[in-house]
Amino acid sequence: MYDSIMSVSARNALSRLSETVAEKGVGSASAPQAVPAAPGASFGEVLSQMTGSVSQKLQAAEATSIQGIKGDAPVRDVVSSVMEAEQSLQTVIAIRDKIVQAYLEISRMPI
């Protein structure tokens, strides 16, 4: 029960992050290698793609977990799917923390 609440909470956090990035129109930068982006894609678009990808991985892990509970999926697939989703979520959280840290540092700069 706790895990399902956490997955819903994680999906909500990802969707809010994606919406915030899309609304703010964060400046352009080169995309990380993990997320292929079109040439000239903005930083906000790259983050939106990344959050969408992580959200899909979380949903796939949840579906695989349910199949595992029913006995339709092998334990190895369940563990692999959940670990992949967890790693992706941790990456997004680390990026979010760095963005917040950079924003706070910029906001403290004298004008």
Curated annotation (Swiss-Prot):
Principal location class: other
GO cellular component, one term: bacterial-type flagellum basal body
Pfam annotation, one family: FliE
Localisation: Bacterial flagellum basal body
The keyword Nucleotide-binding appears for this protein: no
UniProt keyword annotations, A-Z: Bacterial flagellum
Molecular-function GO term, any one: structural molecule activity
Annotated family: Belongs to the FliE family.
Protein name: Flagellar hook-basal body complex protein FliE
Protein source organism: Brucella ovis (strain ATCC 25840 / 63/290 / NCTC 10512)
